[in-house]
Amino acid sequence: MLKEFKEFALKGNVLDLAVAVVMGAAFNKIVTALVSYIIMPLIGLIFGTVDFAESWSFMGIKYGMFVQSIIDFIIIAFALFIFVKIANTLMKKEEEEEIEENTVLLTEIRDLLREKN
């Protein structure tokens, strides 16, 4: 049972997921800082306040906090979209190169077989 767990835990997909979770947490801090210290002050110039969480409320319902969370989510989602798009582009290039190497190797094998016959 321990051996099976070790095989499972050391599989590429599990390790990739673990790395992704850690990187996602670190990336979240970067995006939160971007939103809090750069984007929200710019939006604050338009609306007159930076902190929607405290200033936008009605009878104890802090809908400003909800608006701020939506802005955070949109920025994080967009940044992740760009990151995944770039990663997919890079992975596609690697796959194309690998296919070309296989094609060259198969062509050489075919040519050698033709020479033997």
Swiss-Prot record:
The keyword Lipid biosynthesis does not apply. InterPro entries: Mechanosensitive_channel_CS, MS_channel, MSC/AndL, MscL_channel. GO terms for cellular component: plasma membrane. It is found in: Cell membrane. Channel that opens in response to stretch forces in the membrane lipid bilayer. May participate in the regulation of osmotic pressure changes within the cell. This is Large-conductance mechanosensitive channel. Homopentamer. Its main location: membrane. The keyword Secreted does not apply. It is a multi-pass membrane protein. One of its GO terms (molecular function) is mechanosensitive monoatomic ion channel activity.
